[in-house]
């Protein structure tokens, strides 16, 4: 009996130690607020330099609610507005939208406004844009369309962009 009881007691001790160490994961927050800041050697947007091949300072803030709604603001130093006769050296993007999933497919719909205070261009460089994206696994397809003139170009209302991006692997530095 002593030989049976010892292994049984040992097994029970290990089982109870494991449950004592198990912890409940913290509940997801109702909302998140995050910030970012950085510097780049050349700020490019859709392949075009926004800083005339010079460095740019950038930063932003994002708020997301667990319901899927989000709002954000992002800014960068720029130079191209001055080249066009304007007086703005700063781009500020204001955006908001709604993200949700159905099964394994993620969706994102939103509105984005590129704002260049003091640009004084006619037509204005300020650009409103609607967008929608679909994500399946590592691939995301996104469609964006301006609802006004695009970055100060006359008769450019309705300009669009479509792109597909994907993750090809995970990298880490040690």
Regions found by a protein language model. Name each.
Residues 2-8, 13, 18-174:
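Outer-membrane beta-barrel proteins
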């Amino acid at each position: 009996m002593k030989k049976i009881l010892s292994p049984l007691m040992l097994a029970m001790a290990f089982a109870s130690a494991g449950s004592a160490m198990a912890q409940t994961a913290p509940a997801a927050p109702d909302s998140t607020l995050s910030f970012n800041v950085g510097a780049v050697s050349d700020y490019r947007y859709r392949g075009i330099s926004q800083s005339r091949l010079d460095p740019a300072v950038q930063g932003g803030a994002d708020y997301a609610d667990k319901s899927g709604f989000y709002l954000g603001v992002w800014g960068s130093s720029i130079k191209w507005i001055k080249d066009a006769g304007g007086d703005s050296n700063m781009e500020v993007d204001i955006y908001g939208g709604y993200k949700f999933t159905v099964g394994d497919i993620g969706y994102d719909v939103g509105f984005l406004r590129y704002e260049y205070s003091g640009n004084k261009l006619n037509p204005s460089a300020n650009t409103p844009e609607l967008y929608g994206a679909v994500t399946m696994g590592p691939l995301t397809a996104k469609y964006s369309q301006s609802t006004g003139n695009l970055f100060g170009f006359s008769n450019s209302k309705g300009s669009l962009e479509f792109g597909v991006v994907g993750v090809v692997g995970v990298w880490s530095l040690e």
